Amino acid sequence: YFYEIIEKIDGVSLYNVWHTFSEEQREDIIKQLCDAMKQIHSNIGEKYDWTKTMQEKFMPLYIQAKNLNIFNEEEQKLLDYAYSKFNKYLDSNDFVLIHNDLHFDNIFYNDGKIKLIDFERSMYAPRDFELDILYRMIRKPWKFASEETERYTDSGDYTNIMLYIEKYYPELVSNPNLHQRLAIYDMVYFLEQLVKHPELEELKNDVIFGAKVVALKDEITFNDVKTPMELMDFMNVNIEYGWIDNQGFKHLNNLKGFRKNYRISSIDKMLEVGLGTCIEQAKMIKYFFDKMGFENKLYCYRSYETEENFDKDIRMHCFVLFKYNDSWYHFEHSNRPKRGIHKYDSVESAIEDITSGFKDHGDIRKLTEIDSIPSGLTFKEFNNFVNEFDDTKRKKI
């Protein structure tokens, strides 16, 4: 153990000022942070059984969660399978001293320079464990902000941080299994929160999402799927509702920064990261039915206050209907309460039921049948694409 008495640090939490910086200033600050991490990580520790450490953290929490009946049978099977992969992904040789609580309330800023505070959780661990808190903060910055600074957090301001870390500290992100390792760390972290607050569905979803990421590499591939039910099973395991921003960062079940930073992902990208909005999911569902020879219809429904306000206050839902044995079905995955394959007497009755949930929002409502969803468009560009689509297929309802 070592101790150091330091003088009072001048400055403010980085959370207080991050939103005011230019991108050039942000890059310089992350470069300083990388230099500070390198200095801390230069203290090499002895190797120990990291896999066993994480297993011993996870299992008592998991048993407690099962005793609380938090997870259903299907979810337990997924978690059991993900746990069986800890040995595969957690083997480590690179043990260093880490800060272990790096978020912006523990980084002080003054006159262009940063200083780190609050080293009480420091430990020797694999180098990438430093990202456990830091990467989670990048994805959900408001979670680690104080009550005073939370109002300044906009996830769009954090999208380039990992790019700068890769540039100035590539060793920190060099593990080939980094994606799975960070997902395991998430499983442990969110499970610990969940057993304290079992009523919070968001925490449960975070644990399940981490397990799906760990299991993703070994599951059935999209090309193996042959029937609508197999497609639903595949998507239940491999696709969560979320989006990828224009820097490639993932956002699970939150829309902060969506309008500013969203780009429609390709099917391959959605499968790679396991996230998609109703737009990407409808794109993939239509692709599947086209490939399998099912007659199908792809729709985009929008409701908004006025024509002039279409890109500011709009609700949108993309969905697919398909025909099987002379009946029409709605294949819904992205809308969790409606998830499933639903049979209807006609296309019209399906549309009436699907769009009824949006009737209370906005005076202008449009339903447009489209034949494709281009990748790479912003939300506004996609809305324009749909609005300008073949007028003969557009319905106002």
Name the predicted role of every residue range.
Residues 129-173, 186-200:
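Active-site activation/catalytic loop segments of kinase-like enzymes and analogous catalytic loops
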Residues 4, 38-41, 49-89:
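Active-site catalytic-loop/activation-segment of kinase and kinase-like phosphoryl-transfer enzymes
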Residues 283-356:
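Hydrophobic/aromatic-rich core segments of domains that either
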Residues 6-23, 64, 184, 188-202:
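A glycine-centered beta->alpha junction motif in the catalytic cores
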Residues 213-272:
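Secondary-structure boundary elements
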Residues 323-396:
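Active-site rim recognition segments
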Residues 2, 81-129:
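Active-site acidic catalytic loop and adjacent metal/ATP-binding pocket
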Residues 1-49:
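ATP-binding pocket architecture of kinase catalytic cores
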